[in-house]
Amino acid sequence: MRLNTLSPAEGAKHSAKRLGRGIGSGLGKTGGRGHKGQKSRTGGGVRRGFEGGQMPLYRRLPKFGFTSMKAAVTAEVRLNDLAKVEGGVVTLESLKAANVITKDIQFVKIILAGEVKGAVVVRGLRVTKGAKAAIEAAGGSVEE
């Protein structure tokens, strides 16, 4: 094999459609745009959601709900991340110090994912039932 003999696999490359280059090409004259109408013109076409002047669906239907900003400052922490905290006492501040969560996080919930490496004391954090059972089984405790 030499560099000057390399070529793409058969059928891997498609030649571009050359529009408006004669009747024999199959794409001459109108170039696949049909006859007349807004979409046949240059720059023709309508914006997304436009329904020809009829009130569009996104405006016919009412607004609903909202986006909770609490979700942006809440994090889930896995059990195996608790091992990164030094001292064995897990609080919001100790998780931030260990770079398990970012500094803007205000609420944390510990979930049952991974395994607890040794006894830890969890203070002031929400904990799922399964995670609480796993922490207590490893000799740790959960304090509200």
Curated annotation (Swiss-Prot):
Coiled coil: none annotated. Transmembrane segments: none annotated. This is Large ribosomal subunit protein uL15. The gene is rplO. Part of the 50S ribosomal subunit. One of its GO terms (molecular function) is rRNA binding. Residues 21-31 have a biased composition (Gly residues). Residues 1-53 are annotated as: Disordered. GO terms for biological process: translation. GO terms for cellular component: cytosolic large ribosomal subunit. Binds to the 23S rRNA. HAMAP family: Ribosomal_uL15. Gene3D superfamilies: 3.100.10.10. PROSITE patterns: RIBOSOMAL_L15. It holds the Pfam family Ribosomal_L27A. The keyword Cytoplasm does not apply. Belongs to the universal ribosomal protein uL15 family. The lineage of its organism: Bacteria, Pseudomonadati, Pseudomonadota, Gammaproteobacteria, Pasteurellales. It comes from Pasteurella multocida (strain Pm70). Keywords: Ribonucleoprotein, Ribosomal protein, RNA-binding, rRNA-binding.
